[in-house]
């Protein structure tokens, strides 16, 4: 399946166009972008901001800390830092303070024991942020689409309602890429989010506002969604934890756009947080009845796990080469697991991984059980009503008149070219099924796979336009339908986060979550921005 000469020429032209657009974007950034005295926010000085969600909930239940003090500490941090990172795009501070006061009042009036409180409200009083694509009652729900700028959520998305029911207090909603289909979080309504480790770098997408908000200690737990890496890339670029659950476990209802048909299975809603110990409790709440499909209470003996690893995709001509920093960091993990933990570690070469992008496109090209074609992106741009001409929007964009971002215009222009014919779909569907079987057989119920999160650390703004296919390092596991936990592994020499994906077989999420906690203890986990 070597790429044809025509395919190589098309790729070259696409990258050349992306490079030119990137130059325009960088020039705009230099000439008219926001200026800050520092390239990172100030380090955290408030101790309450350095506690996990579980720790905060325990202190609040024990009445050792007032909920209103916790919420106020986060509001103060947001006011100080958010103007730099633009992670939270709409606050609900007044409502949050009222809800915090109600928690304190409830604890003062009712003398329920700690165990009862934990069982009823495991996240009692814990600050929460929510990706803007999810419905949070009374808040905007546009997904960065100008046509939906006046859309206000009348109800809560299912996962938001579950977390609120568990006691969490939403502070606001966070930025995303337009229609959640690009890996830089920027749109015409809210603007662009910036990486707290270096404001000139991206936060990832589409849950990028959530990633930078958590990394900058403006929140402690958050909600994201992932159909190609939209939880994992922001978690990686911002040095936090994120989990893409096994498909079908966590309800997706109440987000826009909501995947339908064959794609519905691949859209996964999941937790994002700074501390690994919050992942499993969040997942238990967010999954609702679906949690029965997982084994989160099963004790994991890490030494008995089988670890497999691969340092790159095998040489796809579409993707960038993996940075040496990331390869060396992965090897440090491998050496530690083998020599210190004493686990079984094996290097593997899965040859079909080099077709990662093609497998993701095949997933997005799949027809539903009713035979219907997938929803067209250009129809989403028009919010299923307004006709949108991608070519005309490109001309308008060049004149500074379009209400759409260039990645969205580009995708609308190219989607018919990208969408596979039935013959091509069947070819790559067979590859996907073969690779999935190979991985599932290899992993069994006691194996995990370590794989790069992305070929590079967080790139500078606009650079993704020149490397549009690099997301496939995460996208492939969406196509394969496997659970993945994104884990931070410190910072590189320039102060940007390093990390790794930990993959398991279907419904073995408990394995990747256990490995995440171990890696956090061993390699330090989240690093506060501004301390580098």
UniProtKB/Swiss-Prot annotation:
pH behavior: Optimum pH is around 9.0.
One GO cellular component term noted in the UniProt record for this chain: membrane
Topological relation to the membrane, as annotated: Single-pass membrane protein
Active site: 131, 206, 230
One biological process term in Gene Ontology: arachidonate metabolic process
PROSITE patterns attached to this UniProt entry: AMIDASES
Subunit structure: Homodimer.
Task of the protein: Catalyzes the hydrolysis of endogenous amidated lipids like the sleep-inducing lipid oleamide ((9Z)-octadecenamide), the endocannabinoid anandamide (N-(5Z,8Z,11Z,14Z-eicosatetraenoyl)-ethanolamine), as well as other fatty amides, to their corresponding fatty acids, thereby regulating the signaling functions of these molecules. Hydrolyzes monounsaturated substrate anandamide preferentially as compared to polyunsaturated substrates.
Name of the protein: Fatty-acid amide hydrolase 2
Organism from which the protein derives: Homo sapiens
Gene (name only): FAAH2
């Amino acid at each position: 399946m070597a790429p044809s000469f025509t395919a190589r020429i098309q790729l070259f032209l696409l990258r050349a166009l992306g490079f030119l657009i990137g130059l325009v974007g960088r020039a705009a950034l230099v000439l008219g972008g926001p200026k800050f005295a520092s390239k990172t926010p100030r380090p955290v000085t408030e101790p309450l901001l350095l506690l996990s969600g579980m720790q905060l909930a325990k202190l609040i239940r024990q009445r050792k800390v007032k909920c209103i003090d916790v919420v106020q500490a986060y509001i103060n941090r947001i006011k100080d830092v958010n103007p730099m990172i633009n992670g939270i795009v709409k606050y609900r501070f007044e409502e949050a303070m009222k809800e915090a006061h109600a928690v304190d009042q409830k604890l003062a009036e009712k003398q329920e024991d700690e165990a009862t409180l934990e069982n009823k409200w495991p996240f009692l009083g814990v600050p929460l942020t929510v990706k803007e694509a999810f419905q949070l009652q009374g808040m905007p729900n546009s997904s960065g689409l100008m046509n939906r700028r006046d859309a206000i959520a009348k109800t809560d998305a299912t996962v938001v309602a579950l977390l609120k029911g568990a006691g969490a207090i939403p502070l606001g909603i966070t930025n995303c890429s337009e229609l959640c289909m690009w890996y830089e979080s920027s749109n015409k309504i809210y603007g662009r989010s910036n990486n707290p480790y270096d404001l000139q770098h991206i936060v990832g997408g589409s849950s990028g506002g959530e990633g930078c908000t958590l990394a900058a200690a403006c929140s402690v737990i958050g909600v994201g969604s992932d159909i190609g890496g939209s939880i994992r890339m922001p978690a990686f670029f911002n040095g936090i934890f994120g989990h893409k659950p096994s498909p079908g476990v966590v309800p997706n209802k109440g987000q826009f756009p909501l995947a339908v048909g064959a794609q519905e299975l691949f859209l996964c809603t999941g937790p994002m947080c700074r501390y690994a110990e919050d992942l499993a409790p969040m997942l238990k709440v967010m999954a609702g009845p679906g949690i029965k499909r997982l084994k989160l209470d099963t004790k994991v003996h890490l030494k008995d796990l089988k670890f497999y690893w691969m340092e790159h995709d095998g040489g796809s001509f579409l993707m960038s080469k993996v940075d040496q920093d990331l390869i060396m960091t992965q090897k440090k993990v491998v050496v530690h697991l083998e020599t210190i933990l004493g686990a079984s570690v094996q290097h593997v070469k899965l040859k079909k991984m080099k077709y990662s992008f093609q497998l993701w496109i095949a997933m997005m090209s799949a027809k539903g059980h009713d035979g219907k074609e997938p929803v067209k992106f250009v129809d989403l741009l028009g919010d299923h009503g307004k006709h949108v001409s991608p070519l005309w929007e490109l001309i308008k964009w060049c004149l500074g008149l379009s209400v759409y971002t260039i990645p969205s215009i580009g995708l609308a222009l190219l989607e018919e070219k990208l969408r596979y014919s039935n013959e091509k779909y069947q070819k790559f569907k067979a590859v996907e099924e073969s690779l999935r079987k190979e991985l599932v057989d290899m992993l069994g119920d006691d194996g995990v796979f370590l794989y790069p999160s992305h070929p590079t650390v967080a790139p500078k703004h606009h650079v993704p336009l020149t490397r549009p296919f690099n997301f496939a390092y995460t996208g492939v596991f969406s196509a394969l339908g496997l659970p993945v936990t994104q884990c931070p592994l410190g910072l590189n020499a320039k102060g940007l986060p390093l990390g790794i994906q930990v993959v398991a077989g279907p419904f073995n999420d408990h394995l990747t979550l256990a490995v995440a906690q171990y890696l956090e203890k061993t390699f330090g986990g989240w690093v506060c921005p501004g301390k580098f």
